[in-house]
């Protein structure tokens, strides 16, 4: 179950079904499961399913299992098993009991396959892959029966036994369910339920050389675990017929309150790919730095970018659960993290593109300490110490020699307030041989610390800064959307919609209070955005901050 609280319990069609099942007495408890295949890293789409399954279990005082669908050993890895568990925990959830694996049930699944053979409902087929595809037919044309479909039960038992003993080659034969080759649903045209794979399995080793297919395994695993509501995305809607057929034809699962499958729409998020294959292509071709690249939609990538468990859970609650496929605006996810960080992130000052400022009438060699609030509306976050001296750095964009009235920053001959400090006035500047401004010389009003000028003059602009001798060097990674198209999945190739400007790296300075910023610590860098300390590359010797989200939605 979850260890997190939900302010408002959401309502959706699945919860309505559960309410009715409990009211009618069909079920007296609720048991769900999250069943990922350990062949990749979880992404934001999986987070929707995690929040749904664990959230329902929590709200109905039920249980939620974590079960790995590990029936495809060639594509699976123990590293994925470990990362998925870590991601689920990080999101704030805890499964019931031990981690479960479909492979826990391989012996029972084998017995159930034998039961279907004995009932004349499964047969060993020697059609190759191309022949099987040809015999299956199309959506417009019915399939035709395999020449092996009417093999006697005793012979099928013998052949399946030989499959189990490894006496056939991979692809030489497979066990198929005997259903209906004329069914309008392709999944019901005698689907394969066991195939031969001479592959080492991360849980069972080399015990098995035949492995059950997902559609055969999934429903039986649900039933064995007494799952009351098996929640899947809409692409499994047709497969529900096979789900029910398997359980309908096995003696152990005839109870009227057995598990049922319900489908909901998967998450489609703007500017985001969810396909493991396409995401893997980005990683393999080094178009991103890895599965945890902050531009990736993986949980690891979102975490490194600075998204929090609470913001992801809030996003999943806001988008809701429906049967209708739709595209969710990326701005909604941004809003969830922006709102949370606005409330909880301490403020700090960082200068991403430093420009030196010398305050000529400030005493040389003097460094004073200014107390600044860590949060403008949360006194419980306390204060931090800012050093202030004769030399400071401001952002290069915050000074112009000439500007119109809309420019509320430092202009030659005019005043601006330094955040948490004094009012300064630009007097002159130095330039290099190419005309670039290198230093701005200012004067300051010593009687303006924490108050307006005594003579009542108005100073409208406020800019951020850092003190030159105490500021810490830092790298800032400024992330934008990885794709230029709101629907990158529709593009013929990923390359044509890849954003060449999705990452800009700049080197600047942060105030001294951030010298030991812990990994994943979030800050609002005033006037810049919300950032977090990178959880891989940042250290006291080399500070690295990732842009999580802008202060406001630039896509509005």
Curated annotation (Swiss-Prot):
Its main location: cytoplasm. It comes from the Bacteria. L-glutamine binds at residues 69, 214. CDD domains: GlnRS_core. A motif ('HIGH' region) lies at residues 36-46. Its EC number is 6.1.1.18. It catalyses: tRNA(Gln) + L-glutamine + ATP = L-glutaminyl-tRNA(Gln) + AMP + diphosphate. It is an enzyme of class 6 (ligase). GO terms for molecular function: ATP binding; glutamine-tRNA ligase activity. This is Glutamine--tRNA ligase. The lineage of its organism: Bacteria, Pseudomonadati, Pseudomonadota, Gammaproteobacteria, Alteromonadales.
